[in-house]
Amino acid sequence: MKDTKQQFEHVIAICRDLFAKKLHDYGAAWRIMRPSSVTDQIFIKANRIRSIEIKGVTMVDEGIRSEFIAIVNYGIIGLIQLELGYAETDDMTEERALELYDRYAKQALELMLAKNHDYDEAWRSMRVSSYTDLILMKIYRTKQIEGHDGATLVSEGIDANYMDMINYSVFGLIKLEFGE
């Protein structure tokens, strides 16, 4: 379990580094996105991963690693947007965006550690393609919940689905980074 925490922190640091660099280049332009648009953006990334997994080749010189990183970052953006609502302008400083990023990354780590304890690291025996399918399933669930204006009868909400998408992406990145 100790390795899992360190591996999680390692891949989240990679994701955060890219997030911070894009934040510097573009500002928090993503603040204008409604959560449903964030969900669609995650869909594009997950669908591309699945397409690459099935076809085995890419026409664009980026593999699945960059798409898993994007899903982590868009998942955190989605959580921020759910908390604050979308904005009409880029209304957030880099410092505030990184503070929120770190808070949600920490929550994702805590959730992963709790689930990892209960499921005894079952994710390590799974295929990366299964994470892709689980992310796509979570996206479809999220779209259904968004279609119901966020209301559910018995299911977890949009935020829980974003957290799961983040963690499945982290699992994929751990497998890709550490060759497990």
Language model segments and positions:
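Intrinsically disordered, low-complexity regulatory regions
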Residues: M1-E180
